[in-house]
């Protein structure tokens, strides 16, 4: 008798949890992307010398691309993203930058020039500044978000003065980012 009552209670619990799961709406892509972005930005070892991009596919697969300075960052970020509700799998295509004293020196010089410029002081005071400086084999990529096109051009101008082989400017303005998010 006790076993029968237990089985009935278990069946009721399972059926009610299945019904509850059916009532919960599926999370929207924008919500999931915002949660993934929050996880990456709050990762304490994510710096201005790293850049990670996120693409969320319809099946809940999160595709991570970009470049980080240390191998453990790639693994940690992949694990953090995998814990986000709405992410079914993580495809971690983040590349690890090679170790190079020349690249390190270039990173520090460019970051001092950009964040030391009075036009960018308000960014430098942020916990996670929005301009990311990725240096790979002497080639610089500026990524992130700035307020307007003038700041984008100034950042590029400051980055070109330190002997980099090339400077690729992938900075986006607030307006461009807003437009991109509205398409989601």
Language-model-detected regions and their locations in the chain:
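N-terminal targeting leaders
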Residues: 2-8, 14-184
């Amino acid at each position: 008798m006790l076993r029968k009552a237990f089985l009935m209670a278990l069946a009721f619990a399972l059926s009610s949890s299945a019904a509850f799961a059916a009532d919960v709406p599926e999370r929207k892509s924008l919500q999931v992307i915002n949660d993934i972005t929050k996880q990456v930005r709050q990762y304490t070892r994510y710096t201005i010398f790293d850049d990670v991009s996120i693409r969320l596919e319809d099946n809940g697969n999160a595709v991570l691309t970009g470049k980080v300075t240390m191998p453990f960052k790639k693994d940690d970020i992949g694990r953090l993203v995998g814990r986000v509700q709405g992410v079914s799998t993580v495809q971690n295509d983040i590349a690890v930058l090679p170790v190079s004293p020349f690249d390190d020196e270039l990173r520090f010089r460019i970051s001092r020039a950009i964040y030391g410029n009075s036009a960018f002081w308000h960014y430098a005071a942020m916990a996670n500044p929005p301009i990311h400086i990725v240096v790979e084999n002497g080639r610089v990529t500026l990524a992130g978000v700035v307020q307007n096109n003038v700041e984008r051009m100034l950042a590029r101008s400051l980055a070109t003065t330190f002997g980099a082989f090339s400077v690729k400017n992938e900075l986006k303005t607030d307006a461009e980012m807003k437009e991109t998010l509205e398409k989601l």
